[in-house]
Amino acid sequence: MRHFALSLLLCCWCGIAFSCDKAESAPKEESAESQWRNQSFTLATWNVAFDNPVPWDDRKAMVASVFETQDFDIIGIQEPWRHALDDLIAMLPDYDYTGTSVTGNPADTDCHNNPIFYKKERFTLLDSGSFWFSETPDIPGSKSWDSYGIRMCNWGKFRDKQTGGEFFLFNTHFDHKGETARQKTAQIVNERVKSIAKGYHAFLTGDFNGDQWSEPYKILTDQFRDTRDEAVRTENADWHSYNAYNYSDKPLYSGAQLDHIMLRPADLDFVVNEWRIVNTDFNKVYPSDHFPIVLSFSFKFERQ
């Protein structure tokens, strides 16, 4: 009888344990909120400047140092010539890049590039392309209106390996002299981003050669939001993003920016944790005539 009672007790205990295991292992129904995956990374824009007036060889170690200390995940850069681009690739082995030169020939040595650098371990490049700021945007090397030089946009579609989220980045460099060209450029950007990125989240980086009160900037705000205005906190927002290699321990201008990071669509659920200008100097020498603008932010991708 004692053995029977003990066996019965053991069976009951096993049954309870088995029921608990089943309850714990049963899949939980996902809430609407849990069907979103948070994504955060650091994105930047930086005109690293070509060789005039300060030679690249005098600055390249400083530029690489800023990359390493700021730990950019993805960045649109402007103006490097081919030899500078080759140096950056060699000095920054964690990064890959996409983008061609303003002529459309990546092998051309004496012309601007505006590539997108991204960490290979963090992102997969899914698609890429280019268009030019002219009346014939699909013709490489074309320019129009009162544009002084050839200007263009390189873009990439990326997948974040950590979350699977996908987004576009459009990296631009507007003309520095032609006001009509800059306004037309803003219109082309609006049209092309809408056509290419469609419903995806799209970032716009670049040297617009116009501040936040300029007409081209206003045209862009028809589609984009300025991440500076959305930031929870800002750092060095009273500094101008252009320094002309003139060292200063205080802001020289009243917070105007030639360089910008914008984001569309306007209804995207996102948080810009921080927007900052990085005014790093090396013994009172700046690595470029522009400061990098850097975002630390989070936004949510809906699971497909």
Model region roles, listed by residue range:
Residues 74-166, 274-277:
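Structured beta-strand-rich core segments of catalytic domains in phosphoester-bond hydrolases
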Residues 1-5, 22:
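Positively charged n-region of N-terminal signal peptides that target proteins for export
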Residues 50-52, 133-145, 172-182:
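Surface-exposed cleft-lining segments at the edges of enzyme active sites
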Residues 7-17:
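Bacterial N-terminal signal peptides
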Residues 41-48, 63-89, 117, 156, ...:
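Active-site beta-strand/loop signature of hydrolases that rely on acidic residues for catalysis
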Residues 18-92, 102-112, 130, 187, ...:
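N-terminal, active-site-proximal structural segment of metallo-dependent hydrolase catalytic domains
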Residues 27-31, 122, 180, 194-202, ...:
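Metal-dependent phosphoester-hydrolase catalytic domains
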Residues 50-57, 77, 126, 179, ...:
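Short, solvent-exposed loop/turn elements at domain surfaces
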